[in-house]
């Protein structure tokens, strides 16, 4: 499998590096980094002061060169009635997106002894692996340690692991 990371806006090299590392580690796939793209026209909702996540998925699907493509942005994303999302993907689709905007809080609430930079890097890897998992047909998993577990807050992101549980692994083999 080939995954193309599509940076949207000015994305730090560390984010691209961590995203690539997480995907390679979990899915044993080829990963490329696409040229940076501007924020999609029409994605901004001035009433919410946020961006529509669907627009970023469409961008990744359109410009990405991979079998699976993931847009990564630092803009604040929402989807439908949700206040915000860390990421979004269509089940078995070609494109997905994650936002680092709400992953950048400095602490994991004492869950670990890691630095803020390491905590952020872990969150990026987990969310990229999670969203690409959806494009591979994986739904949310009930196992709280599985990367495919639904994580509405950074606390849940911090608690889960970067890897797929055995059940989810078997589904994509």
From Swiss-Prot:
Its cofactor is Zn(2+). Binds 2 Zn(2+) ions per subunit. One is catalytic, whereas the other seems to have a structural role. The keyword Metal-binding applies. Keywords: Hydrolase, Metal-binding, Metalloprotease, Protease, Zinc. Zn(2+) 1 binds at residues 130, 134, 140. One of its GO terms (molecular function) is metallopeptidase activity. Its EC number is 3.4.-.-. NCBIfam families: archmetzin. Monomer. Belongs to the peptidase M54 family. PANTHER family: ARCHAEMETZINCIN, ARCHAEMETZINCIN-2. This is Archaemetzincin. It comes from Natronomonas pharaonis (strain ATCC 35678 / DSM 2160 / CIP 103997 / JCM 8858 / NBRC 14720 / NCIMB 2260 / Gabara) (Halobacterium pharaonis).
